[in-house]
């Protein structure tokens, strides 16, 4: 896919050249061969998400305000009880722990992970801690969706940020309420993977496409013999594989390296309505159409009006009122004819000829699609 940011009217030339260059470079790879492992994955071989509630200690006065976050004090009390330290209930509610923060710990348990293997963990503040920088995560069990503990996390946080505050002023760089611990969790339990079950394995395409499914099945049949693979639908391919573990692993390794010609993706335009960015692939074409687009602006200004009583009046008060002025300005839109465009560079050039802002282009593309002149699927995210 080719990416481009829509153009501001005052700087069309350099961006148009860059877009054409990207289109030519990426468009040259439409027939480039790819491996099966890059378009499909073996069903059942996947990572599993782990989560856990933990505490970060050792903060420099930037932890939770425990009077507002009672679960921080409760979590610390439960942890101390495991160490044989019991606090009176009357004291728990009075704890002022500025160097402790309640956090949510997440990790991805990779496929085939074995006990003792280290995995990375992400740590995010759950309360009102100002910063987790310099903190240490105490032992936190990480559980899967079934409620079983699969890993234990602990270690010093790496927070890619900095901040300082004094005299009512505050400066902050990056995010201080989240961090990461490389290799901070140790796997304690194996997740069974059904790789050796049955007489066949199932490949799942990353994107549903009948053409790609057919090509994957044909590539496997050419290498391992007819009827070794069959496409079940636009995403699933059933492959007959050896039953012995070593032979099956070797079979999968060789199968994933098989080359296949990449099919041309279906034409698609993706619009991000929040950022104003637009992404389209090289299959997008544009039919001949005419567009008129005018800008409409509404400006509201408020002017304070002071009303004072007469000099000799009694009981009068000075009143400040506001007078609002509303102006609506609509700029005329010139009708522009867009020619038929069969290449991405031509589509980019035609859209840039409108001189529209990114937000305007969002509406223009939707209108072109509604008129039947945009030969692509339009997706708004």
Swiss-Prot record:
Q: Name one GO biological process term.
A: bacterial-type flagellum-dependent cell motility
The chain's disulfide connectivity reads none
**What's the short name of a Pfam family annotated to this entry?**
FlgI
- GO MF annotations for this entry? structural molecule activity
Record flagged with keyword Nucleotide-binding: no
Q: Where on the tree of life does the source sit, at the highest rank?
A: Bacteria
Its localization reads: Periplasm; Bacterial flagellum basal body
Q: Where is the signal peptide?
A: 1-33
Q: Please give the InterPro entries that the UniProt record associates with this protein.
A: Flag_FlgI
Question: GO CC terms on record?
Answer: bacterial-type flagellum basal body, distal rod, P ring; outer membrane-bounded periplasmic space
Keyword tags: Bacterial flagellum, Periplasm, Signal
Role summary: Assembles around the rod to form the L-ring and probably protects the motor/basal body from shearing forces during rotation.
* UniProt family annotation: Belongs to the FlgI family.
Q: How does it assemble?
A: The basal body constitutes a major portion of the flagellar organelle and consists of four rings (L,P,S, and M) mounted on a central rod.
* Xref: HAMAP family: FlgI
Full protein name? Flagellar P-ring protein
């Amino acid at each position: 896919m080719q990416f481009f940011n829509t153009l501001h009217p005052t700087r069309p030339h350099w961006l148009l050249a860059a877009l054409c260059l990207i289109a030519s470079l990426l468009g040259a790879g439409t027939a480039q061969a790819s491996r099966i492992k890059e378009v499909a994955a073996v069903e059942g071989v996947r990572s599993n998400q782990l989560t856990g509630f933990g505490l970060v200690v050792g903060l420099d006065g930037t932890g939770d305000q425990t009077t507002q976050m009672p679960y921080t004090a409760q979590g610390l009390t439960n942890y101390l009880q495991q160490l044989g330290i019991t606090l009176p209930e009357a004291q728990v509610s009075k704890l002022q722990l500025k160097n402790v923060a309640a956090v949510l710990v997440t990790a991805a348990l990779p496929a085939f992970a074995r006990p003792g293997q280290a995995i990375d963990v992400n740590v995010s503040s759950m309360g009102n801690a100002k910063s987790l920088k310099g903190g240490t995560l105490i032992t936190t069990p990480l559980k899967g969706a079934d409620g079983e503990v699969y890993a234990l996390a602990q270690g010093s946080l790496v927070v890619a940020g900095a901040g300082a505050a004094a005299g009512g002023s505050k400066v902050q760089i990056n995010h201080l309420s989240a961090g990461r611990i490389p290799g901070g969790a140790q796997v304690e339990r194996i997740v069974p993977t059904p790789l050796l079950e049955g007489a066949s394995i199932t490949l799942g395409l990353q994107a549903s496409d009948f053409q790609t499914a057919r090509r994957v099945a044909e590539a496997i049949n050419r290498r391992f013999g007819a009827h070794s693979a069959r496409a079940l639908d636009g995403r699933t391919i059933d492959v007959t594989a050896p039953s012995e573990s070593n032979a099956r692993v070797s079979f999968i390794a060789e199968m994933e390296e098989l080359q296949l010609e990449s099919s041309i993706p279906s034409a698609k335009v993706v619009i991000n309505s929040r950022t104003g960015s637009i992404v389209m692939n090289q299959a997008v074409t544009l039919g001949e159409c005419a567009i008129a687009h005018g800008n409409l602006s509404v400006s509201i200004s408020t002017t304070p009006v002071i009303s004072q009583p007469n000099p000799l009046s009694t009981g009068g008060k000075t009143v400040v009122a506001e007078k609002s002025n509303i102006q609506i300005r609509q700029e005329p839109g010139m009708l522009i004819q867009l020619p038929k465009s069969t290449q991405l560079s031509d589509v980019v050039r035609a859209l840039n000829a409108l001189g529209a802002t990114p937000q305007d282009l969002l509406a223009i593309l939707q209108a072109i699609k509604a008129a039947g002149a945009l030969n692509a699927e339009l997706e708004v995210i």
